[in-house]
Amino acid sequence: MEQKDSRFAVLIDADNVSPKYIKYILDEVSDQGVATYKRIYGDWTDISKKSWKEQLLRYSINPIQQYSNTNGKNSTDSAMIIDAMDILYSGNVEGFCLVSSDSDFTKLAQRLRESGMFVLGMGEQKTPSSFRVACDAFKILEIISQNEDDISPAITAVSENPARYGTSQDETPFHYKQGRNRTDGFPCTDREQ
């Protein structure tokens, strides 16, 4: 399977990402494969979510309504996690793109990887390292939006966890190897050379 044939589920936490990044998120996913699922989770009755409408229509993203049941509790995260597990067990994708700037999806990223899924994480610079290192690759939205054509700096060296990749702190743990892909179509890591 070629890399561009890989099917992805793109799941976005609207509470922790700005709508200005949607184009860049989808461009990055299209470099990896096809966005089979495009879902975004939030309480769409909240006036602060009004700015999302134009982007959702433009990019055909399915908004998933999740009311805030209790003040201070985030039911959006639970809905996104349940959907991710349903998609995982459907067998319809080879990878997930989890977009959030908080650590609530760390365990989900770990679980998806354990099931053999490629996990691409995206978030703002404030994203905690626990979520970053749980993903196979993590891209910082501020960086990819600054220079869409040059994505190499956006693949962050997840240096907080060098042992996972068998590299030292100074090496980039995840990078593309031209002409050397795994059999599943995803780029090799240093460990897989």
Question: Model-found features: residue ranges?
Answer:
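A polyampholytic, Gly/Pro-enriched intrinsically disordered region
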Residues: 62, 86-92, 141-149, 158
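Acidic beta-strand-to-loop metal/phosphate-binding motif
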Residues: 41, 94-101, 108, 112, ...
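Intrinsically disordered, low-complexity glycine/proline-rich and charged
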Residues: 110-153
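Residues at the N-termini of beta-strands
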Residues: 37-39, 95, 137
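Domain-level signal for Mg2+-assisted phosphodiester chemistry and nucleotide/NA-binding surfaces
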Residues: 1-89, 110, 118
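Short, well-ordered alpha-helical microsegments
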Residues: 22, 49, 105-106, 127-129
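N-terminal regulatory modules in eukaryotic regulatory proteins
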Residues: 154-193
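Short, ordered loop/turn segments at secondary-structure junctions
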Residues: 14, 68-69, 101, 124-125, ...
